[in-house]
């Protein structure tokens, strides 16, 4: 496993949450899983090629966001829309055997500027449009750390479709602030029935449980912790709210964590 992307060691047989920051364990992807991923991406129409060189940020009036699903085994990421040499290459599936997904921030000509699940927080690079398949994402998540509240909004609007009291990081291991996104959504069998991995990393923990301190939104059976600062950086929700989140926040959903 590369030192760059030892974030989540995902497993369908075990999850070590140990209070907040996540460390997941899994075996190799089965051929059927890889085939299913290929089939699902094959059914999505790829974006039409374009020759324009005008830089366009995502329209604030747009009622959805865009996720970029990588469609090749290894994807190059560039420091600018015009760069000829890549700055980074990421495997797909990832080292954790899960599909690689980005959040689209901007587009220019034949490339998209995307947020990626890498340290440091807020890293954004450019990817060729031909290397990804984009899908619309309907909602966004806002986590208010001080209020210990999570709200799901419809698109860019102020229309709330869900609100929940949550537990957040302790004073020693605070939940990081910033603009992130859901990069993995997967069932688990220990501590939480489902987990939404967030492409953000703890500022206090450079490593945790075999990973490098990536945070997540996950369920917690003891609801007495909700409304408190008790985790190692993750956002804990009740199981009932977790199921609602799973349906409202597919991969690529923006996650804004504010004070």
What are these regions (language model features)?
Residues 22-34:
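Hydrophobic single-pass membrane-insertion segments
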Residues 34-49, 55-63, 116-143, 173:
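Boundary regions of SH3-family modules and the immediately adjacent low-complexity/disordered segments
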Residues 10-15, 50-57, 131-140, 173-177, ...:
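Exported/periplasmic cell-wall-interacting domains
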Residues 63-65, 70-74, 99, 109-111, ...:
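Extracytoplasmic
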Residues 81, 108, 116-120, 131, ...:
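A mature extracytoplasmic/lumenal domain signature
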